[in-house]
């Protein structure tokens, strides 16, 4: 008889199906985490300036995260001990995979909407607004994601980011799709490109 494999030895998709309830969110911010959600923990930035939310894995577990996906590279001994919890699942190169994982979790919303990315040094906000308004006038229910917030044009909610991080972006795209949008005009900052925030997003 074969010994039972530990949960984190199973393929990621099976782990999520087994441990996470439908409707749960994925987030990299413990402040937004609700019991049952999935936490994504990975460092972002470079040697000069780096934000590492793996420091909040214990907080995520105490808040009732169903699963914590974490980047195993460079993990301190203290965090390695915390990650012995069966809910913690290592994912190599998570910063670049987070968007793809979250997109799959939310039903790949960008595959069934027209998503237009706007990048550049200046003018992203204005251009994204104009594009969304023009599509709206062509009877294509449109939304925008950017500096002013995210949502359908008549209900834009602040997010605090020009381009939200990968899990939040996929969550927003899923919500916008469920609200009836068929098109999205999205600001794409240089930081977003550098940090892989739009990975998993199909751009037209």
Where are the model-predicted features located?
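N-terminal leader/targeting and accessory segments in enzymes
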Residues: 1-100
């Amino acid at each position: 008889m074969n010994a039972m494999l530990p949960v984190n030895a199973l393929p990621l998709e099976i782990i999520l199906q087994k441990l996470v309830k439908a409707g749960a969110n994925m987030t990299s911010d413990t402040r937004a985490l609700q019991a049952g959600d999935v936490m994504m923990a990975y460092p972002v930035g470079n040697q000069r300036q780096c934000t590492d939310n793996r420091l909040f894995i214990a907080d995520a577990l105490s808040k009732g995260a169903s699963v914590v996906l974490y980047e195993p590279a460079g993990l301190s001994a203290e965090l390695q001990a915390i990650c012995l919890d069966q809910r913690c699942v290592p994912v190599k190169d998570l910063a670049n995979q987070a968007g793809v994982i979250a997109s799959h979790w939310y039903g790949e919303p960008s595959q069934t909407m027209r998503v237009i990315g706007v990048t550049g040094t200046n003018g992203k906000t204005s251009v994204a607004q104009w594009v969304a308004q023009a599509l709206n006038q062509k009877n294509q229910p449109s939304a925008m994601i950017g500096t002013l917030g995210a949502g359908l044009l008549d209900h834009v909610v602040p997010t605090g980011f020009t381009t939200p991080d990968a899990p939040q972006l996929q969550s927003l795209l899923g919500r916008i799709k469920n609200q009836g949008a068929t098109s999205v005009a999205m600001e794409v900052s240089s930081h977003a490109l550098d940090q892989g925030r739009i990975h998993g997003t199909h751009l037209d």
